[in-house]
A protein has these predicted regions:
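Acidic/polar, glycine-enriched structural segments that form the non-catalytic walls/loops
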Residues: 27-38, 128-133, 144-379, 397-400, ...
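An extended acidic
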Residues: 38, 42-114, 200-237
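Well-ordered alpha-helical scaffold segments within catalytic/enzyme domains
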Residues: 48-53, 73-75, 111, 142-147, ...
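Aromatic-lined, polymer-binding surfaces characteristic
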Residues: 119-120, 340-360, 379, 412, ...
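Extended ligand-binding clefts on enzyme/binding-domain cores
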Residues: 183-241, 347, 371-383, 389-396, ...
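Aromatic-rich carbohydrate-recognition surfaces in CAZymes
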Residues: 298-318, 376-491, 508-522, 526
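An acidic-aromatic loop/edge-strand motif
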Residues: 711-733, 824-862
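Aromatic-lined ligand-binding clefts that engage carbohydrates, nucleic acids, or primary amines
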Residues: 746, 770, 778-804, 837
């Protein structure tokens, strides 16, 4: 009997070993993942730096928008200099790169040459169970050097960061300094002017707050603030003992801050050195006109506390990141194979980097995703819907964080429609919907889309928690939305859905499936709340609709794109929630039939979105791939995505909208929707429970929507009442902004000044030259001075003078009017009665516009 047991154990072990060997062999046959762009520093839509090349030395690093955000690293081995990161200095050769690995919290480059192996690791501790750490804007850059030839080597390294990382446009002036924090030293850079949360839009980078490059003085002996190109930089690269201070201010693209020092005298034992890259934005999001702090600042921490904590936690975080990466990658491999795991790691980094965690007035975590490279909207329902699987997987705090600010707005008096909103505004201003008809009318709204999204997501949170308590906070709104889908959901009218680039579509079959599942989810919520009558009503209705759907959408070996369009087809990605939420509304035959059709229909780089075009959506394919929960089906749809990533000619962060025949990007870069890649893990209830149960924060007790301040015109601008200004388009004398200047020879025209088609512009006088100078005398009552702010629309750089004193210098462009207090000198220059306002605006390209007024900003009533 014992011999039989030994034999059984031996056979079991042998089978396991053979399985692992086969798994390893299969992995060996898989080509390495070549990310279109490699994530290096991935925190939020502003602190997001990527390498758009196969090798770290083949291209300069960039912001996700493609604008230069240069990081450079050099190494000197036994007196010979080599590049590790960046293509500059071009006369310094690159150390050969031998490997690249992208993991959920780390990107690891390996280099070899001159008898040493060097790994350069970018660690962003995006640990989802620990929101305190996840929200910290700190990436650790670590060089680890090991000798390979039994010889001793003298190794020095540098890291350089461009001032561009702290500026929206390259010509913005930056100022820099160095500062000690205990045993740490930091080089610091930020814009001279700090327009906090002033700009909104898509192709925008941060120009407030400060970039920090911090290190232990025991590890790095030298620091430099220098010109980006010039002799001082060369001195630092040639002689690491030089310390150079730069005169401030300088243009952002002309500035570098650098640290350097000896790693060690390296033999065969690995030696490491680490620098922290951090960004303190102080305020991150404007929600209903209230500026919110980043979550890590909720208890009063500042940059000093951030850096000290980050330095103290490095070793423990390193271990935690290694453990997290290994465990998550193992779960991804088990769920979908090696290609899926690598795709998941890349998606994980990108998803969290396209949003921001902030604290509400109670210090509770809320988050806002950004619709990168589509229209810049913030808190968009049909963006956080595909993003949601990544947030749902890791627990209720993350899953609720983006719903709370959205639902507070949707349930407020401001949202007057019977369906869910589309968005909260334009990033980083979450001040109310801007898409389509906004709050004004139903033009280009997505009523069934957004309403179905919300009901499904509340159903998913209830599935995770086993109760509907969170839904109870917004029950009246959810009940209203369920009624809307009951009346309008089964056969949608001519309207947009999330795939709005494809245009309006009536009788959308996939949208109908979403509505049906939304109704089923609401029935489940009713059941969990103990309302059995409503639970039966909505569950029965959902089942009846599903049965009708199967009959009316049938088209032979598949189901249609639209009920009234035979011979058409589409991906039915919304069906995944039927199984994840255990609703069982649609028969399994639907998924099987669709999958068989998809597998014979897809192209080289993936399954098209529908029959109308060859383009596809990466996130939706990863959902569609899960429908049958068959591994062969799943891999059949995932493999072309992997091929696309490796072969697309577009070197930018992962797109979710591309052509399936030639792998070219159509649009959409670096969007959070790739969090949808994690949908496959939600089918495994044990895996979902494991990850969700680790939520340490378990947030609750969020504050209601903050009251909007009232903005009252004191000196109206053209958006309310055009006014007459004196203006000139030829450069005047230097005293043009002074109160005693004679502007009688200047022309007179109505505000605003610019060209038709400029976003948000109200044209009173055409201005189409590079520069314009404006003057106007205005009357300001004494009782309005206390809460007085400028009301500005500028495209591009403007200089605003108040009674001859420089009061504001807004840079770049905006797309609408906004309020901004004058600087301290400008406030001091204001007086009761008559005041002279003088403005200069400079234009370089595209639309152009300038207009200025004054408003009184009165706090809203609670």
């Amino acid at each position: 009997m014992k011999e039989n047991n030994r034999l059984a154990v031996f056979v079991t072990v042998l089978v396991a070993v053979l399985f692992l060997f086969q798994l390893h062999a299969a992995g060996q046959d898989i080509p390495p993942l070549r990310p279109p762009a490699v994530p290096l520093v991935t925190h939020d839509p502003y602190f997001s730096i990527w390498s758009p090349a196969d090798k770290l030395t083949d291209a300069d690093t960039v912001h996700w928008t493609g604008k230069p955000h240069r990081l450079t690293s050099l190494v000197r081995i036994d007196g010979k200099a080599f590049r590790l990161m960046g293509k500059d200095p071009a006369d310094v050769p690159a150390l050969p790169q031998t490997n690249l690995e992208v993991l959920p919290t780390r990107t690891i480059y390996t280099f070899e040459g001159e008898g040493v192996r060097l790994t350069l690791t970018f660690m962003t501790p995006a640990l989802p169970d620990d929101l305190e750490v996840l929200s910290r804007p700190v990436t650790y850059v670590t060089w680890t050097v090991q000798g390979l030839d039994q010889k001793t080597h003298d190794v020095w390294t540098t890291l350089e960061a461009s001032g561009e990382i702290a500026a929206n446009v390259p010509n913005q002036e930056v100022v820099s300094m160095t500062k000690d924090y205990g045993d740490l030293t930091a080089a610091i850079v930020g814009c001279r002017e700090q327009p906090v949360l002033e700009k909104k839009g898509d192709d925008i980078r941060i120009d407030w707050g400060h970039l920090f490059m911090a290190f232990r003085r025991a590890d790095f002996k030298t620091i430099a603030l220098s010109a980006a190109d010039g002799e001082k930089r060369k001195i630092f690269q040639d002689d690491f003992t030089s310390r150079v201070e730069l005169q401030n201010p300088v243009p952002a693209n002309s500035f570098l801050m650098s640290v350097g020092g000896q790693v060690s005298t390296v033999e065969n034992r690995p030696v490491s050195r680490t620098v922290m890259l951090a960004y303190d934005d102080k305020f991150s999001i404007q929600y209903m006109k209230k500026n919110l702090r980043p979550y890590w600042r909720r208890n009063g921490d500042d940059a000093a506390a951030l850096l000290k904590k980050a330095a103290a936690d490095y070793e423990s975080l390193k271990k935690r990141c290694e453990q997290f990466d290994a465990e998550l990658m193992a779960d991804l491999r088990k769920a979908g194979g090696e290609k899926y795991a690598r795709l998941g790691a890349l998606a994980y980094r990108q998803c969290f980097a396209a949003g921001k965690f902030v604290a509400d007035a109670n210090g509770k975590p809320i988050s806002f995703c950004k619709e990168n490279h589509s229209n810049g909207c913030i808190g968009t329902s049909d963006v956080f819907y595909p993003m949601a699987p990544q947030f749902l997987l890791f627990g209720p705090t993350l899953a609720k964080s983006f719903l709370v600010p959205f639902m507070n707005y949707a349930a407020s008096e401001r949202w007057k429609f019977p369906f869910a909103p589309h968005d909260l505004g334009t990033y980083p201003h979450a001040n109310g919907q801007v898409y389509g008809g906004g709050e004004r009318n139903e033009r280009d709204q997505m009523p069934v889309e957004e309403t179905g999204n919300l009901l499904i997501l509340f159903g998913a949170i209830a599935q995770m928690e086993g109760n509907a308590d969170f839904a109870g906070l917004y029950w009246a709104t959810l009940e209203k939305w369920a009624g809307y889908l009951k009346a309008k959901g089964f056969d949608p009218e001519n309207q947009l859905c999330t795939d709005d680039f494809a245009g309006h579509l009536a009788h959308n079959v996939n949208l109908s499936a979403k509505a049906i599942i939304g109704l089923g989810a609401f029935g489940k919520l009713c059941d969990l709340r103990g309302d059995k009558a409503k639970a039966v009503e909505y569950s029965k209705l959902a089942k009846e609709f599903a049965a009708r759907w199967v009959k009316e959408a049938a088209d032979g070996d598949h189901f249609r794109l639209a009920f009234d369009r035979p011979g058409t087809w589409s991906q039915k990605y919304n069906l995944i929630w039927d199984r994840i939420l255990d609703l069982n509304l649609f028969p399994a035959e639907v998924a099987r039939k669709e999958m068989e059709f998809y597998r014979k229909t897809q192209n080289t780089y993936g399954l098209p979105l529908d029959n109308r075009k060859d383009y596809t959506k990466l996130d939706w394919i990863t959902w569609t791939a899960t429908l049958t929960q068959n591994r062969a089906d799943f891999e059949a749809l995932i493999d072309p995505i992997y091929k696309f990533l490796n072969e697309t000619p577009n070197r930018s962060p992962m797109t979710d909208w591309y052509e399936t025949k030639n792998a070219k990007k159509v649009g959409f870069t670096a969007r959070p929707v790739v969090g949808g890649v994690f949908a496959q893990l939600l089918y495994d209830k044990a895996v979902w429970k494991k990850w969700a149960s680790r939520d340490k924060t378990k947030a609750s007790g969020w504050v209601p929507i903050p009251p909007m301040p009232e903005i009252k015109a004191v000196v109206p601008a053209a958006d309310r009442q055009p006014a007459l200004w004196r203006y000139a388009m030829e450069k005047p004398t230097d005293d043009w902004a002074k109160t005693g200047f004679d502007d009688a020879a200047w022309k007179e025209g109505k505000s605003g000044f610019g060209t038709e088609g400029t976003p948000g512009a109200v044209i009173g006088t055409v201005w189409n030259t590079p520069d314009i100078w404006l003057r106007r005398e205005v009357e300001i009552p004494a009782d309005k001075l206390k809460n007085l702010e400028l009301w500005i629309h500028h495209d591009e750089d403007a200089e605003i003078y108040i009674n001859g004193v420089a009061g504001a210098h807004p840079k770049g462009y905006v797309s609408d009017y906004f309020n901004r207090p004058p600087n301290a000198a400008g406030i001091a220059a204001l007086k009761p009665g008559k005041n002279l306002i003088a403005v200069h605006c400079h234009q370089t390209g595209g639309g152009q516009y300038i207009d200025v007024g004054f408003v009184e900003v009165v706090a809203g009533e609670k």
